[in-house]
Amino acid sequence: MKLLIFVVEDDVDIARLVQHHLEIARYSVRVFANAARALVDAEKYKPALFLLDIMIPGGDGLQLCRNIRSSENLANRPIIFLTARSGEADRVLGLELGADDYITKPFSPRELVARVKAVLRRFDKPLTPMVHELGDLHIDCERVMVSVRGEPVVTTATEFRLLDYLARHPGRVFSRDELLDAVWRDTAFVTPRSVDVYIRRLREKIESDPENPQYLRTVRGMGYRFEAP
């Protein structure tokens, strides 16, 4: 069965180009020029991945990303921004909203397909088929689920991989570059600053006090370590 990808792009020529190359790569593709319609259909069909332009009718792509991340049915689906906005501030904002990759226009169709495949691989395969029980924190790698004190915590695919990787090496200090190599192997999207963004997002989700984290500790001048209780 082919994986379904939703492309939300109001430029007809770009949408056709993206659809053509993704279908050659054996994906099923649905194209939307309107954010509101895309979200309604996404709740029904639950696509494997979203490709979003930022500037689209019916609500911008950033708001659509927020809506996807707040949806019980869609929150774990990977999101790639495909946009003409190439500034660092736009990239960081995309990260903070939960995007898994960011491709700027103009782009190579071949690279686009490669990046889609890379993101789907990261989403589909947890690092280790096991369960971490760490105090109040529960990480189920088989089911790709996180809970704190029994309450489910919604994470993106990349957030899950980062948390899983750190939890499998408690006490070990990782530099930002080491985490980039281990968790984001296949993408040029992230920078050392991006790691900080993901750590902050995870702290907000799993820590009782994100300003004084119990699990995800900062080691000044070196990077981060996971502290097992």
Regions found by a protein language model. Name each.
Residues 145, 150-215, 219-222:
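Positively charged, aromatic-enriched patches within helix-turn-helix-type DNA-binding elements
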